[in-house]
Amino acid sequence: MDTIENLIIAIVKPLISQPDALTIKIEDTPEFLEYHLNLDQSDVGRVIGRKGRTISAIRTIVYSVPTEYKKVRIVIDEK
């Protein structure tokens, strides 16, 4: 696991009710390094938060981690 993936897990796992259902798939696109968070449907609202404030805060923290050559993007998927 890389640093960004560990950071995402450390932030998201305490927020959700079913942490065992959390999986992260990394997709390398030409412009971005995308981290797809697969969550249980009941946990999606917790991670997004009211008016998107929680996911916005998570993205701010994750985007502050320096990467070598690509921008990082977080995508939330439902199971």
From Swiss-Prot:
PROSITE patterns: KH_TYPE_1. Gene3D superfamilies: 3.30.300.20. Changing R53K: Still self-interacts. Keywords: Cell shape, Cell wall biogenesis/degradation, Cytoplasm, RNA-binding. Disruption phenotype: Cells grow more slowly, are rounder with less elongation, form short chains. Transmembrane segments: none annotated. The keyword Translocase does not apply. Residues 32-79 form the KH domain. GO terms for molecular function: RNA binding. It holds the Pfam family KH_KhpA-B. Disulfide bonds: none annotated. Changing T60Q: Still self-interacts. It is found in: Cytoplasm. Self-associates, makes at least homodimers. Interacts with KhpB (also called EloR) via the KH domain of KhpB. The complex with KhpB is critical for regulating elongasome activity and for KhpA localization at midcell. A probable RNA chaperone. Forms a complex with KhpB which binds to cellular RNA and controls its expression. Plays a role in peptidoglycan (PG) homeostasis and cell length regulation. This is RNA-binding protein KhpA. The lineage of its organism: Bacteria, Bacillati, Bacillota, Bacilli, Lactobacillales.
